[in-house]
Curated annotation (Swiss-Prot):
KW Nucleotide-binding (keyword) present: no
GO CC entries: cytosolic small ribosomal subunit
GO molecular function, one term: RNA binding
Naturally occurring in which organism (per UniProt): Rhodopseudomonas palustris (strain ATCC BAA-98 / CGA009)
Domain of life: Bacteria
Remarks, miscellaneous: The initiator methionine may be removed.
Protein name: Small ribosomal subunit protein uS9
Length: 160
């Protein structure tokens, strides 16, 4: 028993504390125009996003978000990081997005907005990280294999 107590005391003596200097610090990254920039990715889509303080106007490829993303679900996806951070209507978002389909593009814009928000306000990082907005969704289309009709579907099999 005394041996275990002695070894516990030895372990306690070896304990080191992590100081604030070791922990990563995030700083505000804003350009000379007062905008924060980030890139977001989802499937084959890549979005370049700039945010600046404003009235909450979102522009995608020089078009209003309502005309570019006609489906309400896609518009809701784009708004999620702003709503989670309680910053809806406080930032203007300008983004260019290329590649993929509409769903992938909306996901890329959402990822880009989240990263740009953390560049503008680093204290929002924990809220957005908890919501899963800063994590890149790595799921992509599985490649087609030879000897198969698609990635997994086999050709029709005839017994006779």
């Amino acid at each position: 028993m005394s041996e275990t107590m002695q070894s516990l005391d030895q372990l306690a003596a070896l304990k080191t504390t992590v100081t604030g200097a070791d922990a990563p610090t995030y700083t505000k990254k804003v350009d000379k125009f007062g905008r924060a920039y980030a890139t977001g990715k989802r499937k084959d889509a890549v979005a370049r996003v700039w945010i600046k303080p404003g009235a909450g106007k979102i522009t995608v490829n020089s078009r209003e978000v309502e005309t570019y993303f006609a489906r309400p679900v896609l518009r809701m996806m784009i708004q999620q990081p702003l709503v989670a951070a309680a910053r809806a209507g406080q930032y203007d978002v300008i983004c260019t997005v290329a590649g993929g389909g509409l769903s992938g593009q909306a996901g890329a814009v959402r990822h880009g907005i989240s990263k740009a928000l953390t560049n503008f306000e680093p204290e929002l990082r924990s809220v957005l990280k908890k919501g899963g907005f800063l994590t890149r969704d790595s799921r992509v289309v599985e490649r087609k294999k030879y000897g198969k009709a698609k990635a997994r579907r086999s050709f029709q099999f005839s017994k006779r």
